[in-house]
């Protein structure tokens, strides 16, 4: 069974970056196309609102104000308007930042972790190997990996719940496009 607990899911975005089409589409051109910084709000009946990634926030521009990180915003220009961050959109929906108890991070690119610091009570669920791949990198290598360490809160490690350390892998039905699955909340 994939899930036994009904949850609602809202797919949202907080800004977008521009990148040449040919880097992601076979036969694409060099024209820049928008790639929305998507995130999801899951409403769980027992655990409350849960975020899957955050998209960008204005903090991205603070973190990329100086070299070498400023190269990031020139190589991959970001378009973000005040009022579209995850924290602001959730407030509009009546959800305070402190209500987010869990945040699932797919990986550590800036368009996925841009708003992480806006949620002071959230615990972070992620695959240990995805964090291990970036967190000790120097400034240039981190930049090449799309990782801006300043987007993470100072107490990130203390608030971390690496899923592969607390939850066993779950079997997947044949034909699934993923190789790993975990029951993040122990509810099926």
Region locations from a protein language model:
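Beta-strand-turn-beta hairpins that frame and shape the catalytic cleft
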Residues: 2-9, 44-49, 184-188
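Conserved beta-strand hairpin/beta-sheet module of binuclear metal-dependent hydrolase folds
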Residues: 7, 16-88
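Divalent metal-coordination and catalytic microenvironments
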Residues: 9, 42, 53, 100, ...
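Hydrophobic/aromatic beta-strand patches that form the interior of the parallel beta-sheet core
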Residues: 10-12, 50, 104, 125, ...
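Short catalytic/ligand-binding loop motif for oxyanion handling, primarily in non-cytosolic enzymes
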Residues: 50, 59-62, 111-114, 133-135
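Catalytic metal-binding/acid-base residues of hydrolase active sites
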Residues: 55-57, 109, 130
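Active-site metal-binding motif and surrounding structural segment of the metallo-beta-lactamase
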Residues: 65-126
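Metallo-beta-lactamase
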Residues: 78-95, 99, 129-188
């Amino acid at each position: 069974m994939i899930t036994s607990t009904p949850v609602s899911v809202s797919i949202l975005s907080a800004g977008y970056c521009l990148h040449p089409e040919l880097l992601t589409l076979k036969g694409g051109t060099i024209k820049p196309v928008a790639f929305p910084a998507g995130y999801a709000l899951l409403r769980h009946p027992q655990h409350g609102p849960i975020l899957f990634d955050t998209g960008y926030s204005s903090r991205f521009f603070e973190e990329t104000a100086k070299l070498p990180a400023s190269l990031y915003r020139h190589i991959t220009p970001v378009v973000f308007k005040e009022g579209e961050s995850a924290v602001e959109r959730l407030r509009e929906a009546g959800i305070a930042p402190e209500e987010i108890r869990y945040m699932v991070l797919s990986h550590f690119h800036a368009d996925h972790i841009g708003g992480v610091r806006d949620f002071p009570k959230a615990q972070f669920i992620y695959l240990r190997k995805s964090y291990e791949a970036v967190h000790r990198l120097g400034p240039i290598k981190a930049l090449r990996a799309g990782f801006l360490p300043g987007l993470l809160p100072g107490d990130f490690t203390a608030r971390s719940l690496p899923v592969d350390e607390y939850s066993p892998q779950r079997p997947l039905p044949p034909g699934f496009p993923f190789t790993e699955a975990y029951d993040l909340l122990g509810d099926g």
